[in-house]
Amino acid sequence: MTGEILIFLAAGLIGGTVNAMAGGAKLFVFPLLLATGLPPIAANVTQGVALFPSQLPAIWVYRRELLADARTLAWQMLPALVGAFAGAVIMVNSSDEAFVKVVPVLLGISVVAIVLGPRTTEFMRWAFPGGRLKAATGVLLAALGFYGGFFGAGLGFMLLAVLSASAGATIGHVNGAKNLFAGAIQTVAVGPMLVSGLVDWVAAICVLVGGLFGGYIGAKLARRLPDKLARTGVAVLGVVLTMSFLFS
């Protein structure tokens, strides 16, 4: 049991460090939880419960920007929250066998989101000019809500791209909106996870504690490493993990 606790703490530490540097904590936490013998869906539920509080401090930091545009953000958030609840309900009622089959695809999506970054925003503005962008944003936010409730790795990058394309606001405002949406999506998704009975509470608490220390370490490292280098490192490791799922 001591060995498992160390792995849980390491998962949180690595996830928190990576999240603070470039994002994508679930790329690393999920495989480490699987390595301890947790079933795939239990591992996904456990990491969802353990990692969702990490979004809340960021929402508080951006509270002034968010309150200034609260009505618009609330309307935009509705489809995302509906999608999040649906994604979480479907996930906790899926079989481990079916979930494992889609994990490589989900990990691949998150890696692509990390690699593309701001270029996704440029593509959206090109693909949906004028009034079509607003409708496309609603559909995409619903889809991202579903993805966030179902799995959620790389969700922050995807939200940042969609919100940047539609907002036309300052980067601080968009970052605040991204954290708000990610926190709201994960909070809604946690409901079905908590009542599912699949949470491993020892693992969840260890990941949460490790994540707090990892977040501090990652923030320190992020000041010294260029954003592009950190993003590339996370993406490369993500590709390795995805390949290991494909060929395992």
Annotate each PLM feature.
Residues 45-98, 102-105, 186-233:
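Selective hydrophobic functional segments
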Residues 1-37, 125-175, 182, 205:
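Selected transmembrane alpha-helices and immediately adjacent juxtamembrane segments
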Residues 57-67, 105-129, 242-248:
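Transmembrane helix exit motif
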Residues 5, 48, 103-107, 111, ...:
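Residues within membrane-spanning alpha-helices of integral membrane proteins
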Residues 86-87, 141-151, 189-197, 204, ...:
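Hydrophobic alpha-helical transmembrane segments in multi-pass integral membrane proteins
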Residues 26-38, 81-92, 147, 186-191, ...:
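Membrane-embedded alpha-helical segments in integral membrane proteins
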Residues 38-48, 67-75, 168-179:
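Membrane-interface alpha-helices at helix entry/exit sites of multi-pass transporters
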